[in-house]
Structures are given as C-alpha cells and as structure tokens.
Amino acid sequence: MKILVDENMPYVEPLFGDLGDIIPVNGRTLTAEQVGEADVLLVRSVTKVNAELLSGNNKLKFVGSATIGTDHVDLTYLAERNIPFSNAPGCNATAVGEFAFIAMLELAQRFNSPLKGKVVGIVGAGNTGTATAKCLQAYGIKVLLNDPIKAAEGDPRSFVSLETIMAQADIISLHVPITRTGEHKTKYLFDEARLKALKPNTWLVNCCRGDVIDNQALIKVKQQRDDLKLVLDVWEGEPTPLPELVPLAEFATPHIAGYSLEGKARGTFMLYQKLCQLLNITADKSLLDLLPTFNIKAVELATAPNEKALLQLARFVYDLRDDDKMFRNTFLNENGFDTMRKNHQHRREFSALALAYDGQSEVDWLSNLGFSGVGQ
C-alpha cells in the first residue's frame, strides 16, 4: 500500500510505517501525477484536494487531513467518488486556545494593562473558540460568545450578537471557519466599516483564517488608529502576507497557533485511528509514546502566581516573543513563511509542565488551565 503524505506531517513513520510504503511529498506543490498511484493520501491545509488533483487516481482508498478545517477539500467530489475522508476536528484546539490566551497575557504585560478584569468576546464557539474560552474562564475572565450557527442548532451555552461583542468586549478573538456565501458568511466578517467601529483600545486576535479580516482595510484602519492592538497568526494570501501589515501587528506569526507537538501528534494519530478502522485492523500505537519528555521536570510554586508570574509559567512552555521575532526577520525571504512552519518543532502545551504547590484550593484554576501536577 502506497501512503502519500505531506512531508511536514509529524509522527507518520512510527504510526503508519507498518501499514505500507510512506512517500513524503511537498504538500503545497503536490501534483496529480504524484498522486496517481497512491492508495492513501494524507495532507494538511496547504493542499487543495479536488478533481484536478485526484482525477488520474483510481486506487485511492482514503484521504485524511490532519486539520480542524476542511475548506481545502472538495468533500462533494470525494463523496461522488466514494473515497472515504477524515479530518482531525479538535486536534489542535488546545494549542490554539493556549496561543490566544498567551498572546493576551503578553499584550497585558507589554502595555501594563492587566488581562484580569477585561471582557473577552469570542467569535466562533467551535473547538478552538471553546478552548480559548476554557483558558480565560479558568483564569476568571468574563467571556462573551458569538456563534449564530451554534445558537440556531440549540447549543445550550449563552450567546450574544456580534454587535454586543463590539460594544462590550475589550478583546475580540476570532475562531470561525472561512465561508464565502450564505447568511453567516465569514469572509471579510471584519471589513473596513466593522474595523472602524471597534471601540477604543480594542485588542483583536486572529487565529482562524486570514480573510476573515479584510487585510487591506486593516492596514488603513490601523494606520489611523494606534489604539487598536493586533495579534495576527493568519493572513490573506498566505504564504505571502501583505508586507505593510506585519509591522502593524504587536505579535505576528505564520499560521502556527495550532502547532504544538501535542496538537500535531493528535492530528496524525486521529488519521491513523481512522485508517485502521477502515482497514479493520487494531490501532495498537499510543499517542503518549510519540511525545518527547519535557525539558523542565517540574516548577515548585511558593505562592499562587499573580499575572506576571503566570506569564512566566506560560513562557516556560511557549515564548511567543521568539516566534514573533523570527517571523519578522524571515517572512520576506523566499519560502520564509513555509520554512518557519516546517521547522516549528519546539512548542508544547501547558500539560507538559508539572507544577508543585501544596495550597491546592488556591490553584485549582492552574489545573483548569491545563498545567499538570498541581497540588500533587
């Protein structure tokens, strides 16, 4: 069995090596000719899976995407061909939620404006939006959720309108899929008019898709309003973001909010489980066996951490400033965006760091944030 796999997908060899011959390929430049003899195709969001790519293949048994979203996959075409498909919903939700939370802590420190006491509006209450809300609520932050689709589906959580978030939230974090048509389309959800209407001193965080915000309009509005603070992990026209926009963001990164080792492993592992199910064989590999030991054994806390100390704990796990600096230095280079994504192998989730502290009742929130070992 020939397994064609994006060369940047981690842990493929230990998971799929026993199932067939693994053929690594460049996902962004993948051609129909390369796919021709594949039995299994494993991709990431940089690969457009459609008739143009697959029409010359009559052997394909499974297509898997190690991503939350599926907007890069023609699901109708796969269904017409009776080709089984699976993605990895929620695989990197924890990573995205922690990224957004860490970014907010970093902004709070940079501008001496504590996160505690602010109101955060989350637009899109799916896996990543929910994970962001979980972090914020663990820390005691008031969260407003906007998701008209989930509200209409009967989701029991309390939702508010986007207008309410615009009026009441100090921070707005975007977590919607990209949809270009329909009543709730999200392309340019934040157009020039909506960007201009942001209340003074709003922090805007985008970890979903670049064209949820009109990037040209964002440049124009930001140049007029220095009070707006931006955290941008996603960009229109990836992998070539508008060079005028990057310097206007407080933190800028190349679509890596979900790129924790745990999240990457989880995505590949979910596809492994699905393929085993399809082949009717036992999935006998373990997710935990894939992850390396964290380089800090444990951190002992003398007292419950304040916000500054919490940021330091977060930086032990992931220092956003490092990726921001690297991105600014490399994004204009040829392939700089993709090279940084490919080589992004260092980030862990809060669960990798064990905390030791006797005063359990005072730090339950640290456990709820995701840190391990608290009070043990």
From Swiss-Prot:
UniProt superkingdom: Bacteria
UniProt record, GO biological process: pyridoxine biosynthetic process
Residues binding substrate: 45, 67, 259
GO cellular component terms attached to this protein's record: cytoplasm
Involved pathway(s): Cofactor biosynthesis; pyridoxine 5'-phosphate biosynthesis; pyridoxine 5'-phosphate from D-erythrose 4-phosphate: step 2/5
Keyword field: Cytoplasm, NAD, Oxidoreductase, Pyridoxine biosynthesis
Classification via SUPFAM superfamilies: Formate/glycerate dehydrogenase catalytic domain-like (SSF52283), NAD(P)-binding Rossmann-fold domains (SSF51735)
Subcellular location, record wording: Cytoplasm
Enzyme category, top tier: oxidoreductase
GO MF entry, a single one: 4-phosphoerythronate dehydrogenase activity
Residues that bind NAD(+): 147, 233, 258
Its EC number(s): 1.1.1.290
Active site: residue positions: 209, 238, 255
Reactions mediated catalytically: 4-phospho-D-erythronate + NAD(+) = (R)-3-hydroxy-2-oxo-4-phosphooxybutanoate + NADH + H(+)
Subunit text: Homodimer.
Function in brief: Catalyzes the oxidation of erythronate-4-phosphate to 3-hydroxy-2-oxo-4-phosphonooxybutanoate.
UniProt xrefs under PANTHER family: D-ISOMER SPECIFIC 2-HYDROXYACID DEHYDROGENASE CATALYTIC DOMAIN-CONTAINING PROTEIN-RELATED, D-ISOMER SPECIFIC 2-HYDROXYACID DEHYDROGENASE FAMILY PROTEIN (AFU_ORTHOLOGUE AFUA_1G13630)
Annotated family: Belongs to the D-isomer specific 2-hydroxyacid dehydrogenase family. PdxB subfamily.
HAMAP family attached to this UniProt entry: PdxB
Protein name from the UniProt record: Erythronate-4-phosphate dehydrogenase
Organism name: Shewanella baltica (strain OS155 / ATCC BAA-1091)
Lineage: Bacteria, Pseudomonadati, Pseudomonadota, Gammaproteobacteria, Alteromonadales
